[in-house]
C-alpha cells in the first residue's frame, strides 16, 4: 500500500488515538481558570497540587482508555467491517496511543506555562517541536514507511513534554 492508502490507514489510527485525549482536553479547560487565579494569587502550592493530581489522574484515565482500545480493536474492526488492508492501523494505533498517554501523563504542564509570566517559553517550545517533528517525520517515513510517522510523533512529543517538564522543575520546582 502506498500514497493515499497510507493516509487513510494513518487517519484511522489517529482518530482512534485521539479518543484517548478526550479527558485531557476537558481537564485542561477546567484547570486553565483555576491555574490563572492561582498565578494571580501567587498560590504556587495550589498550582503544584493541580499539576501533580492532573498528571496522575490523566495518566490513569488515558491508560484505561488505551487499554480498552487495545483489547477491543479487533472486535471494533470486525463490527465496522474494516477492509483487510486497514488492519495495518493496529500498529499505528499502538504507537500513536502511546504518544497520547505520554502527553496526558505530563498533566497540565502546557497550561501552567502558558498562564505564567513565562508564556513565551510555551511559544518557543512549540517552535522547537515543529523544528524537530517535520524533519524527523520526513526521515522516519523514508526509512520505515507509515509507521515512521508514528515513531516521529512519539519521539518529538516525548522530547517536547520532557522539555516542558524540565522547565517547570527548574523554574518553579514542580
Q: What residue ranges belong to the model's regions?
A:
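Interfacial/gating helices of multi-pass transporter permease domains
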Residues: 1-18, 42, 46-50, 86-91, ...
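Membrane-interface helix-loop junctions in multi-pass transport and translocation proteins
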Residues: 5, 120, 127-162, 166
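Interfacial segments at transmembrane-helix termini and the short loops linking adjacent helices
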Residues: 5, 60, 69-101, 147
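Membrane-water interface segments that mark the loop-to-transmembrane alpha-helix transition
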Residues: 45-66, 125
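Membrane-interface "helix-start" segments
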Residues: 54-58, 92-95, 124, 156-174
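Membrane-interface junctions at transmembrane-helix termini in multi-pass inner-membrane proteins
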Residues: 97-128, 139, 168-172
